[in-house]
Amino acid sequence: MRDRLFSIIYKYNLHPNRDLGQNFLIVPDIIERNIERAEVGEKDTVLEIGPGLGVLTDPLSKRAGKVYAIEKDCRIVEILRREYNWPNVEIIEGDALKVEWPEFNKMVSNLPYQISSPVTFKLLSREFERAVLIFQLEFAERMVAKPGDKNYSRLSLMVRAKARAELVERIGKGAFWPRPKVDSAVVVLEPKPPEERIDLNENLVKALFQHRRSTVSAALKKSAHMLGLSKDKARELRQVFSRVPHSERRVFQLSPEDVLEIEEFLKKEGVIESYPASP
């Protein structure tokens, strides 16, 4: 696999585009483990974002019934179409954040790091069975953080509201070419059953985590403008903010259930309306 990768690179005099986060995974064992973690079989339709030079796409094509690969770099798209003859792979040229995703039940990807967050939120808005994704290590650690952890963040809370996330493997820089500046990690995501998923007001979550180390009441007072409140209205509501559930707890200690309590209280008080739920 590694030899094939570098022969393609030399053949096309290819220089990875760092702006697109092109760091190609070159360790076959990691690729194989991720396919096994996803439990890919012939009945599965798999989505891959950022296929690069096909080192993951190729083995996926041998296991899955159908593979969709979304690639933004037109050079890479042309190379993939020339070098491989996959009868069950459809390459979609475009930006994964802008193109319409096809129907799929599993995702396996080595994601470009700069789009990790929006891709994750887009994924959580979809129905799927399992995703096995490679992220920057720091991002992965935030994704799986628990309430009260030092790196618990808006990302942690929003993932926790919709899915179960587990960091299953750390990957050193040497597993990629060119070597990235940071280590990476594999995260397995499985959506919670529909009855356990929590839809949260995204504006409220952003307002709270803008001041994640503040108390809940203090964070709301500081970020009232993010709820669409004028300065005068925010001053009027200071006493309401002091009475919210969990008012004296730090924001980074809140679970999705806690934030839902706060949201319901603020709706009853007429502070916020039923904005569209987050992904």
From Swiss-Prot:
Subcellular location: Cytoplasm
Major localization class: cytoplasm
EC number: 2.1.1.-
Record GO terms (molecular function): RNA binding; rRNA (adenine-N6,N6-)-dimethyltransferase activity
Root EC class: transferase
Superkingdom per UniProt: Archaea
GO aspect biological process, one term: rRNA methylation
Keyword DNA damage among UniProt keywords: no
Gene3D superfamilies: Ribosomal RNA adenine dimethylase-like, domain 2, Vaccinia Virus protein VP39
Cited SMART domains: rADc
One term under GO cellular component: cytoplasm
UniProt entry keywords in alphabetical sequence: Cytoplasm, Methyltransferase, RNA-binding, rRNA processing, S-adenosyl-L-methionine, Transferase
InterPro entries per UniProt: KsgA/Erm, rRNA_Ade_diMease-like_C, rRNA_Ade_Mease_Trfase_CS, rRNA_Ade_methylase_Trfase_N, rRNA_adenine_dimethylase, SAM-dependent_MTases_sf
Record: residues binding S-adenosyl-L-methionine: N23, L25, G50, E71, D95, N110
Function of the molecule: Specifically dimethylates two adjacent adenosines in the loop of a conserved hairpin near the 3'-end of 16S rRNA in the 30S particle. May play a critical role in biogenesis of 30S subunits.
Matches recorded under NCBIfam families: ksgA
Family: Belongs to the class I-like SAM-binding methyltransferase superfamily. rRNA adenine N(6)-methyltransferase family. RsmA subfamily.
Protein name, as recorded: Probable ribosomal RNA small subunit methyltransferase A
Native source organism of the sequence: Thermococcus kodakarensis (strain ATCC BAA-918 / JCM 12380 / KOD1)
Gene for this chain: rsmA
